[in-house]
């Protein structure tokens, strides 16, 4: 498991960049990429000309405790409790075999790259927001997002955002 946990008090503007260059990462029992805490955001960058694959198994054993003290399952191959940005000119394939592919409990941004998500339930989930396509870009030729869900009767979604806060829970697609 590749885990990110940065002390928000010591590093309130903390940022971590994960440069993927032909990575294949899998874990049968926990999320292969897990972001516990970060001050600003974690960026996952698929480098130009590379294909990167992140896959989880069919059952997760990992959980986290939220700010209300509730224990929740970690239910994505890429799972972030804080802001997450996906970018780069390479290819990222995410296989969410347990439940979801990419899960972000805050803001999820997919700026560019070729992203394919295969999920047992929801493909891409951003609790506060999902934003696809850098709003400052003028060329979206390096952006491609494909979501495949194999959810049978569970009613999974391709792209999902839902928040109890009235100004959150939205999806924006530029391109």
What are these regions (language model features)?
Residues 1-175:
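A composition-driven surface/loop motif
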